[in-house]
Amino acid sequence: MTKAGLHRSILQELVKNGEIYRFGRGLYVRSSAWEDDFYLLQRKYGRGIYSHDTALYLLGYSDRTPAKYTMTFPKGYNALSLKQENLTVKRVVPENYDFGTIEIEFPSGNPIRVYDLERTLCDILRGSGSDVQVVGEAMKRYAASKDKNIHKLMKCADQLRVKPKVLRYMEVLP
């Protein structure tokens, strides 16, 4: 904030008056503003990328609002405050971290980094813990979508080593 020409004492006064509140280190939010948790968490944890069930929701392939957001970080990233958040934390090897990252605009107008649909489908098939019904519905929607990119899905499945699982799902879908 000092870079923006705002002195710390002014920030403290605004917090004291209830006009803003501190969300995290260097992050302040107007008390009257709509709180965009997705954006704020990503600003707080800049290395986090929304993934798994949360990415499905953000991309419009799941109707279930996640009870806990899922973010993926590179292996070795260790922010102690992550444990205090309502987050499921996933870690991946550095060579797979940026693979399939896109930026979408949230309804609030804020940019959100999320894994693309093909990467997300592979991630949820790869791990455990995803609701079978959510996975099945997402795969059905993908198979019926005019925007599906099977070549990209298979390339992603190869890189993340889930090609047999992806093929099994794709074989049984119309």
Where are the regions a protein language model picked out?
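A short acidic, leucine-rich amphipathic alpha-helix
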Residues: 1-2, 55
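Short amphipathic alpha-helical interaction segments
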Residues: 3-16
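Nucleic-acid-binding surface
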Residues: 15, 23, 27-174
